[in-house]
């Protein structure tokens, strides 16, 4: 983890702890998916926080915003940076649809750049964490691509199989749903392990050899009052 002012650069595990610990956030009902276009991959040189500062400078000076527009940015190396606080709506890009909407700017030009596997994993993980935190059900009504509401290609034609609603339903949204399911299972596994006194690794091993084990563990954890 690295912090300069409000900008906090984290890996996925650090991000999970950060988001789960947030208090006093406003209510959010949707998450916007954007690419930066500029900066693109060619502009990323181990300078992630500096890129955040440069984006904020552009948003304030050129777009007349009060601060950086996005709540989060993801980077090719898989790190995620906090920008605008979650006590505020996202800024600028899709006004008036910014109301109760989280803005994610993913660094890259995904009309051209081929997204790294690390960034893919972080984008899916971040969206799943936010859906879990704010009780958002992943769908094309809640995970919104910029191109669906304005005449732009953003978040890019190479974004998770394409930037259409059909592509989102086929490629992106199932990944977010699977990530949410995996999070619920991991939480349930810890609850059942704690309550049963049986080693966590034993339950994980059974998951790999028994069909429908995930659903069973989640049901048991709910009976214990968890998940």
Q: Predicted segment positions?
A:
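Surface-exposed flexible segments
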Residues: 42-57, 226-227
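Structured segments of extracytoplasmic/periplasmic soluble domains
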Residues: 54-65, 126-134, 174, 191, ...
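Extracytoplasmic/secreted envelope proteins and their assembly/folding machinery
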Residues: 49-52, 56, 120, 124-127, ...
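A general structural signal for well-ordered secondary-structure junctions
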Residues: 65, 149, 198-199
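Short, solvent-exposed alpha-helical surface patches in non-cytosolic proteins
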Residues: 180-227
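Basic/polar, cationic surfaces and motifs that engage anionic cell-wall
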Residues: 1-38, 42-43, 76-91, 95-187
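Short loop/turn microsegments at loop-to-beta-strand junctions
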Residues: 68-69
